């Protein structure tokens, strides 16, 4: 299927991604129906062979998605589109064009599936950010120990229905900053990127409302073989456990540290980011398929 796209924004981001956009057009994955924006738009009918459209006329265009090619003013543009069209469900981030080996149809399928990613640290949030997708998970900017995380996974709905409570403060050994340690029933949730416990509770409650229990992807990393085995026995359709050693379990994948990395979690998280190299993130999340890049 060829998707009709309206590009919103010109400038540095547009110039940086133009060759990638042209490649997808030539590959018949997308069709650019127009380029628009608030500023910097040339007084010309076409730019790089694509039609220039006035913002006032976009409601008359037929398109599948609007792609915002602006990082600095992304939120403001999103609000503007919502005011104009009454909806932002058909808005994509420019980050879609930064994904290596992109199959646009698979990206759209992943977006429309409203996937909730559950992880034991920042991997979920990193993956959403890399893909330019809305975070539909409370597990963002925090970490949970292996044992407590397995408890959570054995009764996800039950734990997510509990109240997140403040327990104490701790010091992040990497940043030296203080952060709130929370409890969710009998498990601890370390909100190591939250400014205070009030913010942690607010963000947790807001994101818990977005969880899609009908489409879950469960991620974990561990250096403990017994934990890995217990994770493999969990009855989730889509799941992956990253380990630093060879494993014959279908739900596990060995990840090595890159040069300059000292902690295993650094290697795990970096592969879910825009710097990731080891596997295809979309194939993993959409089809539970480990598609190696090397």
Describe each PLM feature range:
Residues 89-294:
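Extracellular glycan-modifying ectodomains
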């Amino acid at each position: 299927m060829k998707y009709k796209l309206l590009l919103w924004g010109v400038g540095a981001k547009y110039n940086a991604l133009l060759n990638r956009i042209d490649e997808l057009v030539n590959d018949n994955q997308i069709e650019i129906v127009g380029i628009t924006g608030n500023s910097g738009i040339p007084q010309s009918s076409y730019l790089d062979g694509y039609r220039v459209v006035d913002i006032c006329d976009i409601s008359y265009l037929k398109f599948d998605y609007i792609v915002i090619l602006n990082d600095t003013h992304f939120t403001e543009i999103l609000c503007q589109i919502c005011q104009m069209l009454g909806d932002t469900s058909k808005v994509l981030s420019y980050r879609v064009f930064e994904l290596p080996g992109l199959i646009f149809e698979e990206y759209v399928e992943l977006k429309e599936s409203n996937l909730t990613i559950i992880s034991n640290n920042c991997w979920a949030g990193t993956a959403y950010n890399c893909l330019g997708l809305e975070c539909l998970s409370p597990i963002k900017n925090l970490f949970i120990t292996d044992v407590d995380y397995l408890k959570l996974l054995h009764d996800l709905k039950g734990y997510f229905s509990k109240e997140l409570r403040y327990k104490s403060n701790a010091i992040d050994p990497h940043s030296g900053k203080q952060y709130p340690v929370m409890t969710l029933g009998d498990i601890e949730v370390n909100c190591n990127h939250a400014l205070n416990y009030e913010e942690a509770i607010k963000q947790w409650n807001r994101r818990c409302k977005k969880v899609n229990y009908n489409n879950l992807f469960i991620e974990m990393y561990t250096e403990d073989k017994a934990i890995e085995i217990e994770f493999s026995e969990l009855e989730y359709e889509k799941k992956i456990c990253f380990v630093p050693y060879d494993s014959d379990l279908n739900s596990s994948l060995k990840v090595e540290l890159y040069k300059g990395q000292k902690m295993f979690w650094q290697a795990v998280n970096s592969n879910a980011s825009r710097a990731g190299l080891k596997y295809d993130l979309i194939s993993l999340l959409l089809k539970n398929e480990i598609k190696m890049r090397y």
